[in-house]
């Protein structure tokens, strides 16, 4: 069995360089919620050095709230903003001899695109316009995954090690209790259950079906590095290979 392990990087966290030795894919902030040209360049350089797949992490234009504010923007605006961000990272990667492999929206853009078909379509269309060979990463079973498939893109369904789930397979909003799993043992058990058995127990006790093709590790967590190492060890014990 193989699983991709991804982390959101270039967001000002001190652990980026070390996380790149533990993950197989990096989602690099493109300036709209965090990061800048120099940080993008540095992240790309480190990703290439570690053999980690490079991906763009586009966001709503919301540096003030780290891309976590809900926005109602016209689909054409989102299309243009997404194209702008992934185009910038693709060029930075190419200039350093690398290749951008995937795109994963950030924060509220990701969450809204999971449920809003028009928004999902705008993102998938931008990814396709930039490069039809790019992989589109989205929440397992979401509108974004459906939109990607409609454009003929390769999609990668994502699950979260440290997030609580609702009965329909969606994430518990960060504003609600149970959104974040801070108990390491619980997060580890949830991740193995999703990867090995394709299901997750919701905060209300029901089992939800999920397709786990990539697992997100949040690099901004207090114990991100220690948990990443534990997860790698657990995968190795179960014979699960970490690879993009």
Curated annotation (Swiss-Prot):
Record-level GO BP terms: carbohydrate metabolic process
SUPFAM superfamilies listed in its UniProt record: Glycoside hydrolase/deacetylase
Deleted gene: phenotype: Deletion of the gene slows growth on minimal medium with ammonium as nitrogen source.
CDD domains attached to this UniProt entry: LamB_YcsF_YbgL_like
Membrane-spanning ranges: none
GO molecular-function term, one example from the UniProt record: ATP binding
Keywords: ATP-binding, Hydrolase, Nucleotide-binding
EC number(s) recorded for this UniProt protein: 3.5.2.9
Reactions that this protein is recorded to catalyse: 5-oxo-L-proline + ATP + 2 H2O = L-glutamate + ADP + phosphate + H(+)
Job of this protein: Catalyzes the cleavage of 5-oxoproline to form L-glutamate coupled to the hydrolysis of ATP to ADP and inorganic phosphate.
Record's protein name: 5-oxoprolinase subunit A
Originating species: Escherichia coli (strain K12)
Upper classification of the organism: Bacteria, Pseudomonadati, Pseudomonadota, Gammaproteobacteria, Enterobacterales
Name of the coding gene: pxpA
């Amino acid at each position: 069995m193989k699983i991709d392990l991804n982390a959101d990087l270039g967001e000002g966290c001190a652990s980026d360089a070390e996380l790149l030795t533990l993950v197989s894919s990096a989602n690099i902030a493109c300036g709209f919620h965090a990061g800048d040209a120099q940080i993008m360049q540095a992240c790309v350089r480190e990703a290439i050095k570690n053999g980690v797949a490079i991906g763009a992490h586009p966001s709503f234009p919301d540096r003030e709230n780290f891309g976590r504010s809900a926005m109602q923007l016209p689909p054409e605006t989102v299309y243009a903003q997404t194209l702008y961000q992934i185009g910038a990272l693709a060029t930075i990667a190419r200039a350093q001899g690398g290749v951008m492999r995937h795109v994963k929206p950030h924060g509220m853009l990701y969450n809204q695109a999971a449920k809003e078909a028009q928004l999902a379509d705008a993102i998938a269309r931008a990814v396709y316009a930039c490069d039809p060979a790019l992989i589109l990463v989205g929440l397992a079973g979401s509108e974004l995954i459906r939109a990607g498939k409609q454009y003929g893109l390769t999609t990668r369904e994502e699950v979260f090690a440290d997030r609580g789930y609702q009965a329909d397979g969606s994430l518990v909003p960060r504003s609600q209790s149970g959104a974040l799993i801070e108990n390491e043992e619980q997060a580890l058990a949830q991740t193995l259950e999703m990867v090995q058995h394709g299901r997750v127990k919701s905060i209300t006790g029901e089992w939800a079906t999920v397709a786990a093709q990539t697992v997100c590790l949040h690099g901004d967590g207090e114990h991100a590095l220690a948990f990443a190492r534990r997860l790698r060890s657990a995968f190795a014990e179960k014979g699960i290979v970490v690879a993009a």
